[in-house]
Amino acid sequence: MDNSKDDLICIGFEGTAEKSGVGIITSKGEVLFNKTIIYTPPVQGIHPREAADHHAETFVKLLKEALNEVPLEKIDLVSFSLGPGLGPSLRVTATTARALSLSINKPIIGVNHCIGHVEIGKLTTDAVDPLTLYVSGGNTQVLAYTGKKYRVIGETLDIAIGNCLDQFARHCNLPHPGGVYVEKFAKDGNKFIKLPYTVKGMDLSLSGLLTSAMKKYDSKERIEDVCYSLQETSFSMLTEITERALAHTNKAEVMLVGGVAANNRLKEMLKVMCEEQNVDFYVPEKQFCGDNGAMIAWLGILQYLNGKRMDLKDTKPISNYRSDMVEVNWIHDESKNLNDGNIKSRKIPKHLIGKGAEADISKGRYLEFESITKERVKKGYRILKLDELIRTRRTVKEARFLAAVKECGIHAPSIYDIDKENKKIIMGYIHGKIAKDEIEEGNIEFCKSLGETIGKMHGSGIVHNDLTTSNFIISKNPYIIDFGLGKYSDLIEDKAIDLIVLKKSIMSIHYDKFDLVWNKIIDGYKTYELAESVLECIKEVEKRARYL
């Protein structure tokens, strides 16, 4: 490559699943060509081998079209999607890129498909340091850049949202891709059907929701009403975990990317949530939402210009290539640390002492006691029936579990009053700092006591379901708060997922202290008699994660 050129040109090949994409882009961010062809199976469902055959045919056609726009001799770099994705599709894509690289004697770079979505979004919008919700057929993740990596703060624990919608559509004999038809039918729905709503901290589960929606359809509910209810429930869950991640990271921007980002209802929900949280919202234009070659080409340029090089022997596809496996070499501004003050962060209204994903927190007095009032405010993005159900249920649940853990000898705020109608809890004010702030200031000795507290809670058959460093107050002892998602369970896997949620929350903003903090927490947790079984289960749950 001629490194003296002012404007380098890269061609990118995207082929991780059923979409073949070729894009050409310059190092100044000018898109010269971008076209995607989707494989539509003759029968329902995508067969990996047939998708690979589709790539083999369409890459030739797309390449000819691309080179009619940009002569071959102007190409300086070849980029392709290294993963994650379907093995056969990835292999055809890599082979195509290698063949072109060898034939024109130009360097080649394999890139992460997921991060390609994020970077093309940043290029084509005004987003600088966003919290990103990435939603597609094979991926559902909440991502944030910190410490030279895009950290996975939240994700699906089973199936991706796009797959959920497609499977439901197939069950109803609707064509592929099913999400388009679900959105179309949902517009004519007028009856909300209660479906499972499963959020665990900043993670979510969609398999139970899918099964229930299928059963509702089979029971002769109108398809319009089932689609409406499926979409409202699943998208509310997606918006909620994004809002939870926003409250934990204090980012000032949210960006929506991926194929499901084309859904207008999801965009509307996220826009409303961002307005309520007073942060900026971005979504790329439609051609850059779904899988496309331009995003692969752009990420290839970013990596190459910042020193990334690849030999052909290093271009073997990685089907489980997670976003957080990539060392980010193209972002050099370390002011993206949350506490530096050199980049925008979410602002808390002055009349509040805290604003979480669910509630506004204000300080006052109850009789002669210092107190706080926690009000679960209405969420404009959720339909009224669902919003009322969730806020009422969680208000009551939180009060019950705060009382329950205190009976188990665990430190928690005292409940003074509950206003179920207005979704308010008045509780004792705890003098101290949240664990997140203590850790950021370098104080970590208390972390062992966090583990002991969690172990005692699990030993009492209580699972928090939203363990983050934002949900502990450090006073003379650690106080645990925010039990809106809590439940009783003796299942080892439920306790393992509780710790996984905490683990990801620590990695998302305390990455530079992660080993020290996590090891101390685990040391304390081992006082729980079933700790080893839970820790072993964590490994099993993390290994089986399919959607990357």
From Swiss-Prot:
Binding-site residues, Fe cation = H113, H117, Y134, D291
The molecular function terms in GO held by this entry are: ATP binding; iron ion binding; metalloendopeptidase activity; N(6)-L-threonylcarbamoyladenine synthase activity; protein serine kinase activity; protein serine/threonine kinase activity; protein serine/threonine/tyrosine kinase activity; zinc ion binding
Summarizing the function annotation, the protein's role is: Required for the formation of a threonylcarbamoyl group on adenosine at position 37 (t(6)A37) in tRNAs that read codons beginning with adenine. Is a component of the KEOPS complex that is probably involved in the transfer of the threonylcarbamoyl moiety of threonylcarbamoyl-AMP (TC-AMP) to the N6 group of A37. The Kae1 domain likely plays a direct catalytic role in this reaction. The Bud32 domain probably displays kinase activity that regulates Kae1 function.
Report the enzyme's class at the first EC level.
transferase
Species whose genome carries this gene: Methanococcus maripaludis (strain DSM 14266 / JCM 13030 / NBRC 101832 / S2 / LL)
**Which portions of the sequence form the region Kae1?**
1-330
Residues the record marks as active site: D466 (proton acceptor)
The family assignment reads: In the N-terminal section; belongs to the KAE1 / TsaD family.
Cofactor names from the entry are:
Fe(2+)
Q: What is its main location?
A: cytoplasm
What does the entry list as the binding residues for ATP?
I353, G354, K355, G356, A357, E358, A359, D360, I361, K374
Keywords (A to Z) from UniProt: Acyltransferase, ATP-binding, Cytoplasm, Iron, Kinase, Metal-binding, Multifunctional enzyme, Nucleotide-binding, Serine/threonine-protein kinase, Transferase, tRNA processing
Superkingdom:
Archaea
Pfam families referenced in this protein's UniProt entry, alphabetically = RIO1 (PF01163), TsaD (PF00814)
Which EC numbers does the record give?
2.3.1.234, 2.7.11.1
The entry's free-text remark on the cofactor is:
Binds 1 Fe(2+) ion per subunit.
| Protein kinase domain sequence ranges | 347-548
Annotated compartments: Cytoplasm
Assembly description = Component of the KEOPS complex that consists of Kae1, Bud32, Cgi121 and Pcc1; the whole complex dimerizes.
> What CDD domains does the record point to?
ASKHA_NBD_Kae1_arch_bac
| Protein's UniProt name | Probable bifunctional tRNA threonylcarbamoyladenosine biosynthesis protein
What biological processes does GO assign it? tRNA threonylcarbamoyladenosine modification
